[in-house]
């Protein structure tokens, strides 16, 4: 399936002149910049008589490296995802991988686990997959067809009851679908998903897409208008602490869930660039983004301190390791951050190519597994000389 473009679920007249800029920023955040030639070929092939939402991923030749975009640890194993529905599992800390059957052939960009059994994968064509066996098998919970039907039904019922906001949302959906190459699919890419231990969670994506679930993803309700994101900025990252969720986005957007109000409210951060991720720890909130920018707050976002990482490329991951955080950049630079003092220690950079994501190895605390165009690779965490 060829995605119909990223102009979905947002006020088209407000951002028509920024479409190409937004598209480029999303591709950067989704860690797909260097994958564009490959993905163009993939989608051109897939467009001929196939539907990526209904066609399972093809099984690759064993031992042949394939691009990996996201990676996550689950128990003593690792799961990675990539283009054309790729799902892989490693039981030896990332040194070897075996492909896992995938029910779709859409591009997959992120994988998360809430415990050793339950995990979720998100990607293009509004795909959301779920596993209940630690990543051994995956089922579709949501896709672009189901999402379109959900939004039309959800806002349609409220518009009939006189809800003006719902009526506006229906018009936005209609405008997006009128130009869609796949008129029955809302192909907004999902970029992150996260659940707490109660089964409450959110999925976020391009142009302000956000959905909420109270039953581990079995059912969903749209929250697009329940955020301080009227400009429909892309939402890139999620984190949660003690039932409070945080979401990051472009142009310095950071939002915190206010449970009693039932909406995400914006927090002011002294930076206007894109934030790709957020980490919520006890007594410490961190956001990371473009050009090595990392900010920390000890009062839940009221005041901020810039952490001088000394890095000049975008931070793609913050990995907890031995009481510290390892900040990993797209260019392979790394630093360790002490969460108590915010002191920064330089680490040995890794020369492996552009990094899309990173996870701690499942077998050694002095190793990371990084997602690369050439596949997942194990690298050492070592102090700089």
What are these regions (language model features)?
Residues 4-30:
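Bacterial N-terminal signal peptides that target proteins for export
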Residues 2, 44-385:
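Residue-level hotspots at or immediately adjacent to binding/recognition sites across diverse folds
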Residues 28-38:
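Bacterial N-terminal signal peptides
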